Amino acid sequence: MMRSDISNQISQELNNTNINLNGKSFNDYKFKEPIKDYSRYLSLRNSTPCQLTEVEISTFLASSEILSFGAGIPSKLFFPIKELEFNFNFLGNEKVRLSKEDLDLVQQYSDSPGLPKLRNWCKSIQQRHHGLCDPNTPGKEWNLLMTPGSQHALDCLVKAFFNRGDTLIVERYTYGGMFAVTQPSGINFAACEMDSKGMIPSELDNLLSNWESTHPDLKFPKLIYMIPHGQNPTGILYDMERKEEIYKIACKFDLLIIEDDPHFFLQLDNEIVNGKRVLNKSFLSIDKEDRVIRLDTFSKFLSSGIRMGFVTTNSKLFGVIAFELNASIFHSSGLTQIALEKLLTNWGDEKFDSHVNFVQEVLIRKRRETIELLEKHLKGQVEYSVPKAGLYFWVKLLGIDCSYEFVRDVLRHHKVIFGLGISSSPNRTIKTPYIRVTFSYLEKEDGEVAFKTLSDCLKDYIKNKKIIKHDEDVTLYNNIS
């Protein structure tokens, strides 16, 4: 079926269906059966994926029952690492040494989805924090795979679901790194307006209901991309009611949801029960129709340099994403995976929770210090909301219409840089007065200098009402973090 035919079919179904989004509670809402066939969502490259036969697969396997000489694997005699020992936080002076079997395992090719022990630990996270059932529950099967960070996971999703010219629904401002993998693939964006609780349901419903009249040249979307906790760049926290309304709209218009949630454990204002913050439920936790693809990462609360995250979804979509992972990198680094697995296993749930609590307390302190600096140096010059989660303040510079021009022409020459609002906008032709301030990395002494410099430069820039021209062509877009 052609994309235009699908759009017309959905429009016809909506005309024949009266769905009251607000008339029923989420639990009373009549959801359809979970999606059985995902073929209409898949990219052309995944419409006929490369399927290996059992004989071909066995070529790459070696076990006590199979002697395999078909795979291009090096001899264990070549492996350079003979000993490796870790000293982890929250374990005192206790050190963790890798066994010879561990070292042989991680210096050789392994399963594309990741090391089984690490995947099982991550599955326990999803069960503990998102209420997922046993992964093998009949009719509710789900799975996850390890990725070298969510950025690579996004790249896999783009290849799995999008063709050139397809459309993605995004928030009015969103993660700039997402554009690095979508724009080169020719993906179009339709931005939905936001308020203090995230994407506005009525705006989303109106956008999709009037698609053919408002976006006649764009294909009807197949997916929505959202960052629900500590939204990047705004710091917004979607509440449960907002998630439920958006999920019902996704069901109404037959859309999949990409839930990119790097800041899930960085919720800062939630109620504390038994020494732990009660974290908001995710889209994954309310997924009745198998529409959610969830991205998690260890980058924001553990280590960004280890480049490790995981993708969770139903078993049918799991195979599609695993195919793209295998096609691109085979699998994530074995050494990184086992280091993380040993850390998590030796920590256990209690010490993992202690680390999360430690991170939250550090961020609360740094957030408070950032507010003090904003009030001290920039009162009356900026507007901002206090972020409820995540790492960022979304700051509006008063008296200017384009933060990019201000940073390019003035601020950078004073050796101070903030995230550019335009880097988070799906429409790079519209000027924005916003900057993103990463408070997690801010030390108070440096903040004094940076915010004082920002204040002085703003005053001078507005007073002179002119743009200082420079000969060099400078591009300041930062789509990395």
Swiss-Prot record:
Q: Does the keyword S-adenosyl-L-methionine apply?
A: no
SUPFAM superfamilies per UniProt: PLP-dependent transferases
Going by the UniProt record, its keywords in alphabetical order are: Aminotransferase, Cytoplasm, Pyridoxal phosphate, Transferase
Residues modified to N6-(pyridoxal phosphate)lysine: K300
Keyword Calcium carried by entry = no
Task: Provide the Gene Ontology terms for cellular component.
Answer: cytoplasm
- Gene3D superfamilies, from UniProt? Type I PLP-dependent aspartate aminotransferase-like (Major domain) (3.40.640.10)
Cofactor requirements of the protein:
pyridoxal 5'-phosphate
Biological process (GO) annotations held by this record are: alpha-amino acid metabolic process; biosynthetic process
Q: Give the highest taxon in the source lineage.
A: Eukaryota
Give the main location: cytoplasm
Class of enzymatic activity (EC top level) = transferase
> Which reaction equations make up its catalytic activity?
an aromatic L-alpha-amino acid + 2-oxoglutarate = an aromatic oxo-acid + L-glutamate
Example of a GO MF term: transaminase activity
Q: What is its EC number?
A: 2.6.1.57
Family to which the UniProt record says this protein belongs: Belongs to the class-I pyridoxal-phosphate-dependent aminotransferase family.
Q: What does this protein do?
A: Has aromatic amino acid transaminase activity.
| Protein name from the UniProt record | Aromatic amino acid aminotransferase DDB_G0272014
Species name: Dictyostelium discoideum
User: Taxonomic classification, please?
Assistant: Eukaryota, Amoebozoa, Evosea, Eumycetozoa, Dictyostelia
